[in-house]
Amino acid sequence: ATVDGKTYSHHIKVGFSPEKLRPYTTMPSDFKEFWEKEKAEQKEFPLTYTKEHVEKYSTDKIDCYLVKLQLNKRRQCVYGYLFYPKKEGKFPVVLCPPGAGIKTIKEPLRHKYYAEQGCIRFEFEIHGLNPEMTDEEFKEISNAFNGRENGYLTNGLDSRDNYYMKRVYLACVRGIDFLN
């Protein structure tokens, strides 16, 4: 679209007959029990985190903190930026996990309007990558995945107990625990 001489472009995704979509795989008979057990085991581990003020992303309206959230007794962690309004009061909370890919949080202020408009926002990454690391440090770590951007998606796929994404899903639950 062109508005006032400036061209804007964006993409959208739509589903054709989404009501006709059917699962490709069968849900395991113990699916709910498995996840309830995993979440209960995670709750046994104390909620442990550090929260460090990040001046460069704070403004006169919002505060930003870098959070390191420990997930489990294996000391696996995720990092995220926690933004919230400087004004007093209770605020709704927005939990923002990333899209696919191995990356750090590059532009934390791109969604600052959430906090400016009165929401607490926790944007986190799922791989344990400190967003304050240098590009060189990131390159060294990503080489561990043999340069395959999404190699983690099949890491441990042969076992639901060892599947990489199990930790990711539980990290999302832990993020909610942290925000509560």
Predicted features and spans:
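N-terminal cap/lid segment of alpha/beta-hydrolase-fold proteins
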Residues: 29, 40-89
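Conserved hydrophobic/aromatic pocket- or pore-lining residues that grip, position, or stack substrates
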Residues: 35, 172
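Short beta-strand element of the alpha/beta-hydrolase
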Residues: 79-84, 89-100, 110-111
